[in-house]
Amino acid sequence: MRSDIVEAMATTRAIHIETEIPGPRSRSIVERKERVVAEPLSLYLPVVAASGSGATLTDVDGNTFIDFAGGVGCLAVGHAHPRVVEAVTEQAAKFFHTDFTIVPYEVYVTLSERLLELAPFSGPAKAAFFNAGTEAVENAVKFARAYTGRPAVIGFEGAFHGRTLLSLTLTSKTHPYKAGLGPFAPEVYRVPFPNEYRDVTAEDALAALRRALLTQVAPETVAAVVMEPVQGEGGFIPAPQDFVEGVRALCDEHGIVMVADEVQTGFSRTGRMFAMEHFGVEPDLMTVAKSIAAGLPLSGVLGKAAIMDAPGDSAVGGTYVGNPVAQAAALAVLDVFAEEGLVERAQHIGETIRGRMSGWQERYPAVGDVRGLGAMLAVEYVEDRATKRPAPEIASRVAEAAAKRGLLLLKAGIHSNCNRVLCPLVITDAELDEALGVWEESLDAVLA
C-alpha cells in the first residue's frame, strides 16, 4: 500500500467537532424539551442525536462523537448495525404485534432456543420475555416466589435492579433513584457487597449474609437472592470468586433461588457471553436485557425449567412482552456476536483499556481504583488515596471535558465518582485509541 494512503488512514479521526458543545440546534431542541417533557427526565448529555454508526454518534449540529455511553450498555453491536437493521425491517414488514399469548409467533420460540443454548444451565431450562430490565427482575422474583412459596428477597448494597416498585426497592442508591418515592415493597432485605477497594472482603460480605439469615429474616422464608455478578450502577465492582461460590452454597443449603442479574453484564460485555461464566457457578435464574436487541425494548428471564414452570397459568406476561420486531433484532444480534467474534473482541478491548487505565492510575493520584471484567471497566476518583474520600466532581468534570472533545462518557458508583466504559464492542482499534486519547486529554485538563 502507498505510504501516503497509510499515513492518511493513520491520521483519520472518527471524532469531528464543528460547533461548541452543545451546538445551537441541540440547545434549541433542549429548550423545547424543557417546556414539554417532564422535569425528572433530565439530561445527562445535552447533545441531541441525529444518527449513529458503529461506535460513533452524530448530533443534529453535525458533531460526531465516539460513544462510550452506548445507550447505557444497550449497544454491544453498535449503532445501526446492518444485520440488525435488515432483520428489523423484514419483521416490521410482516407484522408488529399480536401478543404472544393470544397469537404466538415463531421468532419468540427461536430466540428462546438460541439463548438457552448459550446460557449457563446444565439441565432443562426455559425462557420468558418482557420489555425492560426492571420487568425481568420483577418477574424473576415472581418465578422464585411461586417455586418456593416464600415471600422474602435479599439484595446487596450498591445494587441497581430497576425503577419499578420491587426492583427499585432492591436498588441501593437513594439519590436520584429512591428519595421521596416510598413506601417500598415489603420483605426485601439488603446486605453488603464485596468491594476490595473499600475494604469489604468476600468473607465480610458472606458473614453479613449469614448474619442476616439469623437477625433479619428466617432462611425458610427467603425466596431469592438477587445479585449482579458485576455491580453496574454501583461502580463496576466484580464479585469475587469465593463470594459467588459462597452465595451459591448458602442458596443450596436453604433452598433459596439464586438470581443472577445480567442485564448490564450480559452479551459479551465482560468477555464472556454471560458474566456468570467467569465463575463457573450456575445460577437458578438469570435476567437479561440491554444489548440483547441492540437498543430495542426487550428483556428476559432464563432459568431452570422447574422454576420457570412454577407460576400458574397467565401469572406472568403483559401486552407487549416479547415483541416480535425486538426479537428479530435479538436474533440478528446473536448472529453478529458469532460472525464477528464479539466475545473475543470484548477481551481485547478490555486488555487495551485496562492497560491505559493502569497508566492513568500511576500518573494521577486522583485515580484511586481501576476495575471491572472484560470491556466492562471503570475508574474511581478520590480526593486522596489515604482517605479514599470519593470525588464525584472529578467524574463530572472529566465527562464534561470529554464531551467537548468528542467522547461520550457516563458516570457510575453510589457516590457518582466513577467514569465507566460501555462502548460498542464493534469499535475499531483506531477508534478505541482515539477515545482513550481524548479521555487522557480530559484527565490532563481536569487534574493538571
Protein language model regions, located:
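Conserved N-terminal phosphate-binding loop of PLP-dependent enzymes in the Aspartate aminotransferase
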Residues: R2-A448
